[in-house]
A protein has these predicted regions:
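Long, contiguous amphipathic alpha-helices that act as assembly "spine/axial" helices in icosahedral shell
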Residues: 1-43, 76-91, 127, 172-196
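Sequence/fold signature of self-assembling virion shell proteins
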Residues: 5, 51, 55-63, 100-210
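Short, catalytically relevant binding-site loops at active-site mouths
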Residues: 36, 92-96, 133-135
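Extended, solvent-exposed, turn-rich assembly/linker loops in the middle of proteins
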Residues: 42-115
């Protein structure tokens, strides 16, 4: 009974670990849907890929101020709502931006990013750092190796152009496993899915990592 109670205690190690795991699963679902194939039509059998017009090449650079400006221009040109724009990136891209004077200087940015070592919101985007890994051991935000360099595929999107659906809320159980000498198994489950609704509100931007 005490173990079952721990599942519902938000401060318990079980609940905290499960919360992190579920959070990573939701992050991966949203990220994959943003860059993956969306399906339209009455029967959902019409595949739509993210067009090249919604992709920014790395150009052998990391996450620069110039690249951030291009992202803003793309969203503005597509008349995308200003108040719900997000950027998904990793610690490597944050490090790039913290080296950009216009991002860290108080003359340009009231947030004073360099003092805090983080960027929460800038140029109309809210920044979300995703460093979590998948079950495969690879990062949620995927990368390829190009000419010996790691190229990270980051994402900028507007919330009204993406959709996350929760088909089944979290189910939690603690049971002994007879095949494991009756050691305790903690089981969490939920059903989720995500889809890209409008290509104009999603941009893949690639960044070289040093």
């Amino acid at each position: 009974i005490d173990k079952v109670k721990m599942l519902h205690d938000p401060t318990s190690p079980y609940a905290i670990s499960a919360s992190f795991a579920m959070g990573r699963a939701m992050d991966a679902e949203i990220y994959d849907a943003a860059l993956g194939t969306a399906y339209t039509g009455k029967n959902g059998n019409n595949p739509i890929v993210l067009p090249n017009s919604q992709k920014l090449a790395a150009d052998d650079k990391g996450f620069t101020f110039a690249k951030l400006k291009k992202l803003k221009r793309m969203f503005d040109s597509n008349d995308i709502e200003e108040h719900n724009r997000y950027i998904l990136y990793t610690a490597a891209q944050l490090d790039d931006l913290l080296g950009e004077e216009k991002v860290t200087s108080a003359d340009y940015n009231a947030v004073r990013a360099l003092e805090r070592g983080e960027i929460n919101e800038y140029m109309g985007f809210k920044f979300i750092q995703l460093n979590g890994v998948r079950d495969t051991g690879k990062k949620i935000i995927t990368a390829d190796t190009v000419s010996g360099k790691t190229v990270r595929h980051c994402v900028a999107f507007a919330t009204n152009c993406m959709k996350l659906g929760i088909g089944e809320d979290v189910k939690a159980e603690i049971t002994p496993r007879a095949d494991k000498n009756y050691s305790t198994q903690v089981y969490f489950e939920m059903a989720i899915g995500a889809a890209r609704l409008e290509e104009e509100g999603v941009v893949q931007f690639d960044c070289v990592e040093s």
